[in-house]
Amino acid sequence: MRLKINKKVWRLEFVKAAAMQSKRNWGECDLPSATNPLMTVRQSLQPKAMLNVTVHEMLHACRPELSEEAVTETADVIAGVLFKLGARITPPTV
């Protein structure tokens, strides 16, 4: 899926753990300076975790200057509220 964030086109992909740079990660995000920036989210996550990780990686893309702690705290709040409001992510099928 292609997304425009801060005037740059990003790809967002939901992938198997084996496709992640580290199999321990739930999500990953390139730096905005990358030629073709990519965000990946593990596709096997439960709905609440998938929403949280997607918001988390999008925050990294939008605000790369934020610390990991700030991104985590902000994603937890935003994703928690969105989840309570009924938001869920349905990854595109390939």
How should these model regions be labeled?
Residues N52-A61:
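Active-site recognition of the HExxH zinc-binding catalytic motif
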